[in-house]
Amino acid sequence: MAENTVNAINVDPSEVEKFNKLAGEWWNKTGAFATLHEINPLRLNWIEENVKCGYVSADHQKTAEMGLAGKKVLDVGCGGGILSEAMARRGADVTGIDLGTENLKAASLHAEQSNLQDTLRYQHIPVEALAATHAGQFDVVTCMEMLEHVPDPAAIVDACFKLLAPGGVCVLSTINRNPKSYLFAIVGAEYVLRLLDRGTHDYAKFITPAELDKMAIDAGFTRQDIIGLHYNPLTKRYWLAQNVDVNYMMAVQKPRA
């Protein structure tokens, strides 16, 4: 398993500052995070489908019909809470964690305005630190669009494994590393189409599916599914497909002993 040291926080301060400066934009659906709002229904449905297919409860019964409803969910790197809120609305009991204090203020305020305080809460804590005190406490863990922003993504994946109860499902998303992903995710998204602010991504931190698969296996997970997320700039339409050349999501499961 990846070595995990809680004292050495696995974070790039410049990345935290970058997103803190944009904290006021999280719930502006036409602002800096418009792309996240647009893809949120796709990723939410894919997460729920994988929970239905993979989650196994303590009594070894697959609760396929329930999906996210009734599950304890941890959203790692929750930002302003776009995905966290959506999962809470599906009936999950959600905890979102992030290291950006301004992000969490925006997330908490919006949750209060949306009357979701009973099923949604936020904490300012590294995932490794939470794993040291809350191992095995969650049915589902999500870590979306975060791994390519940290120094040691393997440690994040390892912490996600520790936090899951046996039989739980973890969904990860990141960006593949190849010439096509550089062209689409950086040149296209940041400079040509301006879907994202310039400097949002660092190509060297992109992660291939093989690398993420190895991180997951080393942590103890078994692979469940993988899917690519695609965008047509002419029609402004997003969809899921098997091609994982650029953005992709991976669902993995913690085996039940």
From Swiss-Prot:
Residues reported in the UniProt entry to bind S-adenosyl-L-methionine? 43, 77, 98, 144
Reaction equation(s) it catalyzes: a 3-demethylubiquinol + S-adenosyl-L-methionine = a ubiquinol + S-adenosyl-L-homocysteine + H(+); a 3-(all-trans-polyprenyl)benzene-1,2-diol + S-adenosyl-L-methionine = a 2-methoxy-6-(all-trans-polyprenyl)phenol + S-adenosyl-L-homocysteine + H(+)
A Pfam family the protein falls into = Methyltransf_23
Q: Name one GO molecular function term.
A: polyprenyldihydroxybenzoate methyltransferase activity
Domain of life assignment: Bacteria
UniProt cross-references to SUPFAM superfamilies, sorted A to Z: S-adenosyl-L-methionine-dependent methyltransferases
Describe which pathway this protein belongs to, using the record's wording: Cofactor biosynthesis; ubiquinone biosynthesis
Q: What is this protein called?
A: Ubiquinone biosynthesis O-methyltransferase
